Every structure is written in structure tokens, then in C-alpha cells.
């Protein structure tokens, strides 16, 4: 009999990722020992080093500039700072693992304001981006996103 278990491990820092991966292997083997498995039945933990996504790192100085430009363009009340999330995105690769290229990733709200207010009131989560129930409101979402991006481009290209 063979059991295969696949996991996605997400961390904000590479050293934490290495510790988590080592702990997974240690726990798997510890459980096998505790269950009395013979040596030839010990779990084999394979980590695919190439199959991971680095954490997105928003450069603080760049993020301040982008946030100020977007606030100026669409109104400060329409820009909120979000807590870090464990969402995986290959955007992280643009700044490289050492963050030597400044990057800033931001989201654009796309939910019906009535549903957003209801979610805030009740605590019920809204469907996430990859959910089949995610239903963005095209306008004003597209308009707002274009204004925000243009404000960012103008800020970052001014002399």
C-alpha cells in the first residue's frame, strides 16, 4: 500500500520555509516510528524545490509613492491597506528573491459595494478571486483600476 500526500507550503521568508519543510519530514517520520513501522516502510518526503512561489515583497518606499499617487487620483477613502496574505503569485519573481528590484503589487476592489458592506457587517467571507462564485462588478472596477494604474505610471515616470 502506498499513500501519497501533496502539500502547498507558503511562508513569507525563505528560511522559515526551509524550517517548515524540515519539520514536515520530521513529523512524518516521527509518526511512522510512533506507529511502529519498520525502517523499510518509513515515509519518503520529496520536496520539489522548483515548485514553489516566492512571497511577494512590496518595497516600502515604492509602496508609499504608489499609495500616495493612487490616493490622490481616486480619493484617500478609496484606498485601504491590507494585511499580508498567503496568496501565491509569480509577480514575486519580478523583484527577485533578494528584492533587488523594487516592486509593489496592489489589488483593486471588484465586489459589489452592497455585498462588501454586508460581508463587513456579518463577517461572512466574500468569494475569492479564483472562486467560481467570484463575480466582479465591471464598472466602476475597470475605470478605477485604469485610473490607479495611470496615476502610478505618471508618478513613477515624472522627472
Predicted regions and their residues:
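Metal-dependent amide/peptide-bond hydrolase catalytic core
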Residues: 1-159
